[in-house]
């Protein structure tokens, strides 16, 4: 089930022994620097704690929390395993795992817990000055390129971003033999990118490689952010510098 912060059940889902399918929220935004206001509580067959899929959904959907209740051989509740996203921290930890406990013995004021978490996220957002530049994460996939070439191209991309008035706050790279046709990067690295974008309070993700329309659309939906590639960034710079009507038409 999905439960809101008032304790009301908003969605009921039925899965199988391996997985459940969460609702498709489409482009319903959670708000920058904000969680979605829903926690997912579901059961696992046997003594399995939170899985990689659970943590991926927690990150991609920006849920308040992900809770998995194990079951005994008799079909009774076992332990409740819970995790929540962490704001940016010195340890670099993305997820906080709460101490497993029988469901009836969970000792957590969830409203207070999530209120403190969102206050911490709000404080981080307030460190941005009014009128400050857009903040971005740069992403590069090797796909057979040499490390030296990647480093040089990323340095060049940073300079292009600065020329466009964008503040680069992080860089994510992935080494893989070929790019993913749907997302450019792998699902594991996408999960990491979602969390880092959330923690860094960014507005924009810039890919070093050219994205297909399908890749750009899929990434924007998953990240809930504006996603562009190197070519689009260069066009943005031209557009900013175009003063005449003819110049603007040429950029378009």
PLM region spans:
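Extended, highly charged alpha-helical segments
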Residues: 233-252
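N-terminal accessory targeting/assembly segments
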Residues: 1-230, 234
């Amino acid at each position: 089930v999905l439960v809101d912060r008032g304790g009301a059940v908003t969605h009921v889902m039925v899965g199988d022994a391996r997985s459940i399918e969460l609702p498709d929220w489409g482009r319903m935004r959670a708000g920058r620097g904000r969680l979605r206001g829903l926690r997912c509580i579901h059961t696992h067959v046997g003594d399995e704690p939170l899985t990689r899929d659970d943590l991926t959904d927690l990150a991609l959907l920006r849920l308040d929390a992900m809770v998995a209740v194990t079951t005994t051989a008799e079909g009774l509740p076992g332990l409740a395993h819970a995790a929540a996203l962490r704001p940016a921290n010195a340890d670099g930890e993305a997820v906080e795992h709460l101490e497993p406990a029988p469901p009836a013995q969970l000792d957590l004021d969830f409203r207070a817990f999530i209120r403190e978490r969102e206050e911490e996220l709000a404080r981080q957002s307030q460190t941005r000055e009014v009128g400050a530049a857009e903040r971005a994460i740069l992403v590069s996939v090797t796909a057979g390129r040499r490390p030296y070439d990647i480093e040089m191209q990323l340095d060049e991309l940073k300079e292009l971003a600065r020329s466009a008035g964008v503040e680069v706050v992080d860089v994510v790279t992935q080494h893989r033999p070929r790019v993913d046709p749907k997302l450019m990067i792998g699902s594991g690295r996408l999960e990491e990118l979602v969390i880092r974008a959330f923690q860094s309070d960014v507005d924009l993700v810039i890919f070093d490689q050219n994205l297909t329309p399908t890749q750009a659309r899929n990434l924007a939906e998953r990240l809930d952010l504006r996603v562009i590639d190197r070519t689009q960034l260069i066009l943005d710079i031209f557009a900013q510098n175009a003063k005449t009507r003819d110049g603007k038409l040429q950029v378009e």
